[in-house]
Amino acid sequence: TIETPHFVLLASMLMLCVAIVTILFWKRDVAVIRRGVLVALFLEYLFFVLSETIFFRDVMETRECHLELFWNYRLIREDPAAANGIWEIILNILLFVPFGLLIGAFGFKKGKAIIIAILSGFLLSSFIEGSQYYFHKGVCETDDVLHNSVGCLLGLGIFWVLIRGIKIIKK
């Protein structure tokens, strides 16, 4: 049987594909097509992230909040059994890499793109952490906000490297 969250995510991917195909065949202007595809990808990404972090998470009995910055690192250093926390850090960074890629793809100037990546990564992550706390859907952690913001900047950097590589190949 297909679990409800997986079904909803599959359905949203199907809707994304339909939206992109519709945009590609409806509009002839390349800039309009690019913008439409980016908006569709951004909305799908946002839905995926919110589904994974809030919508389809189990409700916890109590609220938990860790506002001390770098508490994960201290825990990992002090308790070798908590080494799986490294994976949590890596996954939090990776979760926001696509967000940074999309910010880069929207074509902002470098300085503005960096500011947008930092602010939007911080704000989206803060919204998620606050919602997890409010709705009992996870532990609210400042470390997660930091790691997500780093992931967003990393995604932006990856975008710039990809674009530079494409320009070199085209020459």
Regions found by a protein language model. Name each.
Residues 1-136, 142, 156-171:
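Bulky hydrophobic segments
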